[in-house]
From Swiss-Prot:
Superkingdom per UniProt: Bacteria
One of the record's GO molecular function terms: structural constituent of ribosome
Protein name (database record): Large ribosomal subunit protein bL32
Gene3D superfamilies recorded: Single helix bin
Family as reported in the entry's similarity comment: Belongs to the bacterial ribosomal protein bL32 family.
Gene: rpmF
Span list, region Disordered: 1-59
């Protein structure tokens, strides 16, 4: 079994754990519909992605 040679300092432990926190999801306002959507995702209301129609729009 592997055993650490030195004690991990609180600073190093904190730096390792800094990526463990949950982050709130990011939303942006769509330019065309004004709806909130995730960046780099299809706008489900209009079916548009990067200026092109990908899905049929929802009514």
């Amino acid at each position: 079994m592997a055993v650490p040679k030195r004690k991990t300092s609180p600073s190093k432990r904190g730096m390792r754990r800094s990526a463990d926190a949950l982050k709130a999801p990011t939303y942006i306002e769509d330019k065309n519909s004004g709806e909130l959507r995730r960046p780099h995702h299809i706008d489900l209301k209009t079916g548009m992605y990067r200026g092109r129609s990908v899905l049929p729009p929802k009514d």
